[in-house]
Amino acid sequence: MNISVDLETNYAELVLDVGRVTLGENSRKKMKDCKLRKKQNESVSRAMCALLNSGGGVIKAEIENEDYSYTKDGIGLDLENSFSNILLFVPEYLDFMQNGNYFLIFVKSWSLNTSGLRITTLSSNLYKRDITSAKVMNATAALEFLKDMKKTRGRLYLRPELLAKRPCVDIQEENNMKALAGVFFDRTELDRKEKLTFTESTHVEIKNFSTEKLLQRIKEILPQYVSAFANTDGGYLFIGLNEDKEIIGFKAEMSDLDDLEREIEKSIRKMPVHHFCMEKKKINYSCKFLGVYDKGSLCGYVCALRVERFCCAVFAKEPDSWHVKDNRVMQLTRKEWIQFMVEAEPKFSSSYEEVISQINTSLPAPHSWPLLEWQRQRHHCPGLSGRITYTPENLCRKLFLQHEGLKQLICEEMDSVRKGSLIFSRSWSVDLGLQENHKVLCDALLISQDSPPVLYTFHMVQDEEFKGYSTQTALTLKQKLAKIGGYTKKVCVMTKIFYLSPEGMTSCQYDLRSQVIYPESYYFTRRKYLLKALFKALKRLKSLRDQFSFAENLYQIIGIDCFQKNDKKMFKSCRRLT
């Protein structure tokens, strides 16, 4: 897999470069190298999974085939099917764009609200028996299976036996097949072409492989069948029986059987398991080779494998789920994956009734004027547009007094904004848990209706490093809005960098909006929900408490329009403090 993080991108996004990819339905159908087509599909799918689990971003693919046109040729059915296998509703998460010789896939962050799952998974690699089939559990089934195991702290290796005998009537059940398979397993000799007295079921699987590819085929199928039987109720795998349920057997020397038994043991012992119980036992199985005789002469063998049901969870291989960590695309470890699947998400106060309750006990001084008047007086600095909320007011005033030209610059920048909130900070980077840049004068985050958030960075030192600072801050902010704040819509954060000279002159040194293009859906943001998500993210990061008084500035951060349903409650809360 050749996926790398593009560190030179202009986007304030996680951009994953998947290399050269052939695109278009006809072109992908005509690819002679099927392995290459599969590898390209795998790389795109893993990159998508990694971005979904890492706050969203962009997949960048260099277009392999000449004269490709997205509008004429499309993407390719195999890729589209992979997208559908990952996502229930593809348009909710993905947007596609061709930019010259590059194809870009914009990926929105995974949303817990969509499926109830905290992460995206390409394959759980947890198998189960569904009557006569071994099937991999989808993420939802895996979640239920793991939750049940965690709740019960595992299970007994064997099903409890019935205490009372049932009436002996002419009833046939699956357990009859399992019992007959057990009798067959205990035999020492078999007759060629002998018919079985049982068939495939939840507890029985029958296979017939040619001698030439016997070892290879057993190694290929063994993990999924062992996982399926162990995760269900145990069962038997018989190799050397045909579709007509006749005993055929395979030819082998004794040394071949020894090698085969060692490979089976090696394969089973390296299968990943996860325990919720205290015993932490190994997979319990028995392997034997039953001699097949034709008119009294040994002519082959049947491989018989009995797998006991397991106490906890058995994987065929590690879960196929990815994320971006330390600028690398990495597969989640089994432990990480299970924690994301079954551990409860920490709950943080997000209801405004709870927020109001905090205000009642947190406000340091009484307010005798009505809430709306208090809101108006605290929101707007004199001389600035009433369409924009500026906060925190004290920092805003101080910056305007200390730095000539900043107020005029802000007025000019906000002139075209219909309605918005401009939130100042000495360092948004520090607020988000990143490293401080002492050369930065301040940052300001603009959140307005139907327009992407804009992060303004102001500095008084000529230095090119501010682009990296601003880009990283914007990227982190976007990720926090989605993963911590719970913002479920598509969003991007634009950046703009200004230089303020000691004489009060200002100049724009960088404007991301002139450098990159996003799909249309990224420009229609919801200000109200962005502010809510921002509040939740900062509250969890404790930036609100660290930067300025939590209660005193709560309304300024969220905005009065977000509280319209609770105006009466808030008014009463404030009045009780007088």
Swiss-Prot record:
InterPro entries listed in its UniProt record = Poxin-SLFN/SLFN_N, Schlafen, Schlafen_AlbA_2_dom, Schlafen_AlbA_2_dom_sf, SLFN_GTPase-like
Q: What is the effect of changing K213R?
A: Loss of function in the E2-induced apoptotic signaling pathway
One Pfam family name is SLFN_AlbA_2
Tell me one GO biological process term.
Answer: rRNA catabolic process
Q: Which PANTHER family match?
A: RIBONUCLEASE SLFN12 (PTHR12155:SF2), SCHLAFEN (PTHR12155)
**Which domain of life does the protein's organism represent?**
Eukaryota
Give EC number(s), comma-separated. 3.1.-.-
Q: What is the enzyme's class at the highest EC level?
A: hydrolase
Q: Which family does it belong to?
A: Belongs to the Schlafen family. Subgroup II subfamily.
Signal peptide extent: none
Q: Which GO terms describe its cellular component?
A: cytosol; nucleus
Q: Which UniProt keywords apply?
A: Cytoplasm, Hydrolase, Nucleus, Phosphoprotein
Looking up Gene3D superfamilies in the UniProt record yields: Schlafen, AAA domain
Question: Which residues, renumbered to this chain, carry the PTM Phosphoserine?
Answer: S368, S573
Whom does it interact with, and what assembly results?
Homodimer. Interacts with PDE3A; direct low affinity interaction which is stimulated by binding of 17beta-estradiol/E2 to PDE3A and that positively regulates the ribonuclease activity of SLFN12. Interacts with SERPINB12; as part of a pathway regulating cell differentiation.
What does the UniProt entry say about where the protein is found? Nucleus; Cytoplasm, Cytosol
Q: What does this protein do?
A: Ribonuclease which is part of an E2/17beta-estradiol-induced pro-apoptotic signaling pathway. E2 stabilizes the PDE3A/SLFN12 complex in the cytosol, promoting the dephosphorylation of SLFN12 and activating its pro-apoptotic ribosomal RNA/rRNA ribonuclease activity. This apoptotic pathway might be relevant in tissues with high concentration of E2 and be for instance involved in placenta remodeling. May play a role in cell differentiation.
* PTM summary: Phosphorylation at Ser-368 and Ser-573 negatively regulates the ribonuclease activity. Dephosphorylation is induced by the interaction with PDE3A and stimulates the rRNA ribonuclease activity.
Manganese recorded as keyword: no
Q: Which residues cross the membrane?
A: none
Recorded protein name is Ribonuclease SLFN12
* Location of the region described as Mediates interaction with PDE3A in the Swiss-Prot/TrEMBL record: 551-560
